[in-house]
Amino acid sequence: MNDKEKEICPRLIDFLVVVGKRNRTRGASQSSPDATTDTTVTYPEILRRYPTDDHKDFILPTDVTVFCQPEGCTTTSARLRKNARNDPQFFVFMLTEKDSAKVRYGICLNFYQSFDRRSTPKDEIKKVPDDAHHKKRDSHVSLTSLCFISHHPFVSIFHQVLLLLKRIIDSSNHRAAQRTGLKDVVWAILTGHYNEPIVPEVMKEIKEIETWILMLLSSPVPVPGKTKVQIEVMPMDLSQVFEFALPDHTRFTLIDFPLHIPFEILGIDMALRVLTAAMLEFKIVIQSRNYNAVSMCILSIVALLYPLEYMFPVIPLLPAYMPSAEQLLLAPTPFLIGVPSSFFHHRKIRELPSDVILVDLDTNCLQVPDDLYIPDLPEPDATHLKERLKNAINKMTTMTVDNETSVTDADFGIDIDSVDVACRVAMVQFFNSANVFGNFSEHTRTLRLYPRPVVSLQTDSFLRSRPQCTQLITDLCRTQAVEYFAECCLCPKNETFVRVQAGIESAEQVGDKPKWFSESLMPVHFMVYPNNSTLDSAIRVYNAEIDNDDYEDDSATSTENSNSIDDLVFDENQVTDAGGEVTKPLAEVNYIYKEPMTLELPQSESVVSIDSSLSSGRSSPDSSLSTSAVDSEADFARLADNLALKSNSQGAFSFDHGSDSEYESTPVSQRRKTIHNPGSDASDTPTSRGSIKSGLRMKGLTTLTDSGEKVLGPSLMNAINGYAEKSQSVFSQVINKTAPKAQALKERTMKPLANRIEQSQHIVRSKTQPNPTSQQTANQQSKNQQTVKEFCDQALVGQSVGMFSAPKLKRLMEDESLRELVCSKLNLGLEVKLSEDEYVKEVQLTKGQFKAYVKILKACLEGIEVSFNTPGCCGFASVFHVLEIAHTHYWAMGGGEVITPSSSAPSTMTTPSEHSNDILKESRPKLPASTIDLRTPTKPLGQNVTPTSTNNHEIAQSTRSPALPPPVPPREAPPIPKRNPPPLGAPPKVPEGARAPPPLPPRPKVKTTAVDETPQNLVPNNQPAQPSSPSFLADADEQTKPLLKPAPPTTLPVGKQEPCKVLPTPNEPVRHYIYQELILAVQHQIWQNLQFWENAFVDLVAQEREIVGMDQEPSEMIDRYSALNDSEKKRLELEEDRLLSTLLHNMTAYMIMCGTGQKALQQKVRRLLGKAHIGLVCSKEINKLLDELPSTQGNFIPLKPLGSRLVQKQSFTVCPGQSSDGQMMFMEVCDDAVVLRSITGAATERWWYERLVNITYSPKTKILCLWRRHDDKVHMHKFHTKKCRELYQCMKAAMERAAARGKVNVEGRALGGEFPVHDTETNQGGLLQVRCDGVAVIFAHNQIFIGLSNIKKCNTFGGNVFLLEEFDRKKGEIIQRRYFSQMADQICYAVLCVFSLAAAGHKKEEHSK
C-alpha cells in the first residue's frame, strides 16, 4: 500500500447503519413470526443508514448486513428470550476494499428488539390487562444491529457511543409510548416497521434523534500528533466528553481494545504458537461462540506481528450467512479468518482443508494438520519473550486482586493499557533479538527508489550471521512480510520499532493511548448535543423508571448465540437488495449533516495547510538568484542578516531562528547519535530533527521528563508549523540507522582487523590489551592502509610481492575496505574520463607490473572468498572492481621491458615518443582497434614526484571512507613500454606453464578524433585484420591510416560466433590479460555460485547509489519524486534504470569471463532484471545481450563505465557560519541539487534547486547566503568560503541548466502580491502591494509608494510586524515604517524575490553592454 492509500480520512465516522429484518406486508415467501416455529432466520437487510448518500471515496458495501449479523437475522419469541441476558453483544469486523486495499472498521452492537405496535389508551397505560401474559407469550423480537463504519479504529469509544445511542432511542421510545400509547413506535419507525402516519409527538422524537446522529457524523477526525477532538454528546451529568486522539509516527499505532486477549484466553505458550503460524503465513481459522473474542483475537495477532505486516487477507469475523463464504477457506493464499462456532455446521463443512490450522477459543484447542509443522521459537529469545509476557500478564492479575478493594476502575484501565504496551514492546524486542532480526539492515540493499522502493535482502548472508540458524528464521526469510519489512526499513511509516531498539520502552514514550500524549495536543471542541434538544430529559426520566418498569422485558434482550442451531429455520432465498428501500431521514434534517472534507486544525496566527505541496517552494533561477547590483554588498548582507536573525516569538512564520540554524547545520552523523541514548528525552526521538525549542532540547540531554513531550506556551503553533519538516527529516535519521545502503558497510569495515589478523606473524601487536579502544582501532586501520598502499606502489613500479609478505597481504585482503583501496590504486583506467556511450578502455602493463597485479589480485579473490563464507561479512562489491582490472589490464608478450624506478639509470628511460617517427615510416598492415594502447601518455615513472604532492595524496587517501573509497584523483600512469618487435619469422616467447590465451575477436570499427593525432599517442600496430562476422570488420581505409585512439563501438559485439584462432604474426605482440592467469589458471567455486553473484551485485548497487548520492535521505527523495511532474519522474526512473542495467551488463561480462554456466547466467540476470523493475528501454538492451552471449569463456563483452565515474561534480570547501573557524565541509554542485558533505565524505544535507529561494554572496566578507523553502518556512544558511564568487557562479549556472531542462518548476510562483496590513503609527488598515518597481501601501484616504531603489532594509519583528526602512533622498534621512500583519514573513519574502529579480536583470544589462 502506498502513501495515498494511507491518507487520513477526514471523517470520524463514515456511516451509521441500522440492520435487521425488514417488515414486508406482501410476499408469501417471507417467514411469518406467527408460524408454528418459534425461531426463524432470515437474510439481514439495511433498515436505515445515515447519511443516505455515499461518499465520493467510499461507497457503503451491500454485504455489510451479513457482517453485522454473521449468523443471519434471528426472529424469535419474546417468551424464549425472557430468561436470557439483557446485555447487547458488541464486536468488530473489517471491510477491505479489493482495489485499494483500504480497511474500514465496523463497530457493531447487536440486541433483540420488539416492534409491537399495539395501541393502548393513555388512561390505561398503567393498568395491567388480564391477558397480559398471553400477549407477551405471543410477541416476537428480532435481532437488530447498530453499526458504525469508520476508517479509524476507535473501538472502545465507539462502543460507548453506540450504547449511548441505544439509550437515547430507548428513552425517546419510552417517552413516545407514554405520550401516544404506541408501544415501540420509535424503534418501529426507525426500522421501517411502522406503515401508518406518524403523529407529531413521535415525529418530534425522531427529529431529535436524527439530528443528534447527523451531528455526530459531522465530527472531524484528529490529526495524529497535533490535535485531539473533544466531542460533547450529552450534558456532563449524563455522559462524559469523548476524546479522540491518534498517536504520531513515533508511537505504536492505536489499538483501542485489550491487546493481550490471545494470551489471556489461550495461554502464553499456545498464543505464541498461533503467532508463529501467522508469522510464517500459514492458513489460520479461529472460531468461538463469542463474536467479540474471535474478532479481537484476530486483530490482536495482526498487531502483535509489528514491525512485520501481515500481507494477506484478514477477516476478523467471517459471516456464516454470507453466500459462498466457505470458498474463502479454499483460497491458495494464506489467510487469518475468524468465524462463529456455527460456521462449519451452517456451511455444511465436515472437514477442513488439509493446510488450515484451526484454533478453538472456547475449548483452548489448537488443531494442526499432520502435513504442517510449526517450528519452535529460537532460544534463549523465546524464553525471554515468555518471561516478559508473563510478567505483564501477572502484573494485570495482581492489580485485578488489588483493585477489588483499593483501586478505582480508572486506575485499573491504566494498568490494562500498560500491559498491552508491555506485550507489544516484548514482541518488538523478540523480533530485534540476535537470532531473529538483529542487525537486519546490514543485510539489505536498496536497488531503486522510484517509482516505489525496491530493497533486496541478502538472505544467505543474513542466515549465516545468526548465532543459531533455526528453522523458524529460515522459513521466516521466505515470507512476503519480511520482504516488505526490508522495504519499510528504508522509509518507515512508524518508527516505534527503532525507538524500542534504542531502549525507549515506557508507555509514556511509545504508548498509543491519548492519556500518554494528549496534553501536548491542541483541542478541537465539537458539540453534538443541540441547545434546544430535550433528549437529556428523556434519558433522565427513562433512567429513573427503568429499574421499576418491565418495559424491556419483551423489547431489547440479549444476543447470546443459540447453542442449538438445529432448532433454527433458515430462509436463504430472501437475499434482496434493499438499497432502493432506504429512505432519507424521516424528519427532513439532511441539512444538519456537514461532511468533513479536510483535516481540522485550530486557528492560529499562522496559516498552515495540512496538504500543502512541497512544490510551493520552487523558483526559477531568474527569480531566485541575485547579486549586489541594486544596493551595496554590505547593505544586502545586512538585509540577509536581518532576515536570518530576527526570532519569532509569536510562533508564526520566520526566515530563521538562531537555534534552528545551528541545529540544522549539524551533520546528520552527529544528530544520529541520539538513537543510541535510551536516557534521552522522549521528544528527542531517534528520528527527530529540527528545533523544538532550545530550552527543551537542553533539558532532554540530562533528564527524562514529560516536558520533552510537550510544547508549551506560544511556541506550540511554531511546533505545528515545523511539524511537517520534522516528520520529513525524522525519517531521514531513521534511514541512517536502518536504511540498507552502504553506510552500513562503512560502519562494519571500520571495525578493527585485529580479530582476523591477530594470528598473523607479520603484525606485531600488544597482547595485554585484548579489547583495543577506538583510537587504537583507527591507528591499526591506518597502518593497514599504509601497508596496502606500499604493496600497490611496488606493483605499479613492477615489483612483485615477496614470499614472506604474501601471507600478510592475504590477511589484509580479507577486509573489504582494503580491497577497495587496492582496486582504486591499481585500476589505471580510472583516470580516463568517459562518456555514457563509451566503453571501458584497456590498459597495457609491463611484465613486472603484470606479475605483481596477478599476485595482489589473487590475494583479493581469496579474501573475497573468505568474506563470502564468513557470517556477517562486510560485503564484497570489490569483486567487480577486481574483475574489471582482470578484464581490461594486459601485458603484451614480446613488447620489451620498461626500466623501473629501481633502475640505476632512470634518466635514460625511453619513451614511446622517441620512436614515433620510425612508426610513422612503417608501411605494414595495421592491427584492428583491439591492439591499440588506450592510455594517454603521461610522465614516465622514473621522474621524481615532489614530496608535497605525495603527502597531499596520502592525506586524501587517509580521509577517504574505508568502505567506499571514491575514485582516486588523476595520477601519473606508468609509461607506455618501448616495443621491440622480435625478428621476422620468430614467434613470440611464451613463458613455460602459461596457458595459451584464447583467440581474440577483432574489435569494432572505430572513429578517429583530431585530438589524439599527435605522434606520441601512436603505437605500433602491425597485424592484419582477421576474418570475423561483418559487424566486427574494419574498413580497409581505416587500416591504412595512422593508428589513433579508438572511440567506443556503437553496437555491442555480442553476436554468436566461434572466435577464429588468431595466429600471431612475427611483428604483433600477443596480449596476455590478467584474467587468464587469475581466472583460467585456478577455477574458484564461487564463480558457479549464483547467490554469490547476486550478493555482489546488490552490494555494488548500494555502493554506486551511495557514491552518486541516490540514497541520501531516501524519504525526502521519495517525497520530492511524488511532487515532480511526469517528465521529471520518468527522468529519475531512467537514471536508476541506467545504473542498474550498466551493472547487470558488466556482471554478465564478468560471468562469461569467469566461466559461469550460460543457462544459469541467463536465469540469474533475468531474475535480477525483473527484481529490480528495470524499465523497457534498458531491459531491452540486457535481453538482447543475453540472447547473443558468446559461447567461449573470455573477455569478449566490453565493459560500460560505472555511473559514479560519469558524474562530474564541482566541489568547494566551505565552513558553516560567518568565519572560517567552523568545521570544514564540502559543498558539491550537482545537476539538480546542492549536496553538503562532511570531511569524511558523508552527505549531511541535500538542497534541491526547486526549493532554493535566494542566493547571495559578499566578496568582501567571503560569505555565501543561501535561503531554502521547506513547508512554507524559509531557512537561511551562511557559509564562509574563499571562493564565494566561483561557488555562486557555479550554482547559478547549474540552476540555469536545470531550469532549461525543466527541473525547476516556476509555475504558480507569481512575483509580488497584496497583503493586508495595519500601520502601527496611524492605526489605519490597508493593503500592501509588492510590485516589481517597489512597494505601495494603500489606505482608505491616502497611498504611499516606496521605490525599489529607496528601500534600504526590510525584515520581520516578533513574527507579525513587517519593518521597512526607506531612504528619503531629498532629506537625506532614513524613514522607518512598521506594519502589523499576520503575513509579515510572506511580505518580506516577496520583497526579497523582487530584489533578486531586479539584481538578475541589472546584471544581464551589464553583460549586454
UniProtKB/Swiss-Prot annotation:
Q: Which InterPro entries match?
A: cDENN_dom (IPR001194), dDENN_dom (IPR005112), Death_MADD (IPR056574), DENN_C (IPR043153), MADD (IPR039980), Tripartite_DENN (IPR037516), uDENN_dom (IPR005113)
List the molecular function annotations (GO) for this entry. Answer: guanyl-nucleotide exchange factor activity
Report the residue ranges that make up the cDENN domain in this protein: 251-390
Keywords annotated in UniProt: Apoptosis, Cell membrane, Cytoplasm, Guanine-nucleotide releasing factor, Membrane
Bias class Pro residues marks the residues at 963-1003
User: What does the UniProt entry say about where the protein is found?
Assistant: Cell membrane; Cytoplasm
Does this UniProt record's set of keywords contain Cytoplasm? yes
Location of the Death domain:
1109-1184
Q: In what residue span(s) does the uDENN domain sit?
A: 26-230
Q: List the disulfide bonds.
A: none
Found, by tissue, as follows:
Expressed in nearly all neurons.
Q: Does the keyword Transmembrane apply?
A: no
Pfam families per record: Death_MADD, DENN, PH_MADD, uDENN
In terms of one coarse class, where is the protein primarily found?
membrane
Matching PROSITE patterns: DENN
In this chain, composition skew of type Polar residues spans 680-691, 761-772, 941-961
Q: Tell me a GO biological process for this protein.
A: regulation of apoptotic process
The record's region (Disordered) falls at 654-701, 761-784, 902-1008, 1015-1034
Composition bias, Basic and acidic residues? 915-925
Role description: Guanyl-nucleotide exchange factor that regulates small GTPases. Converts GDP-bound inactive form of rab-3 and cab-1 to the GTP-bound active forms. Regulator of presynaptic activity that interacts with rab-3 to regulate synaptic vesicle release. Is also a regulator of the cab-1 synaptic transmission pathway. Probably by converting rab-3 to its GTP-bound active form, plays a role in the recruitment of endophilin unc-57 to synaptic vesicles.
Q: Which family does it belong to?
A: Belongs to the MADD family.
| Subunit organization | Interacts with cab-1.
Q: What name does the UniProt record give this protein?
A: MAP kinase-activating death domain protein
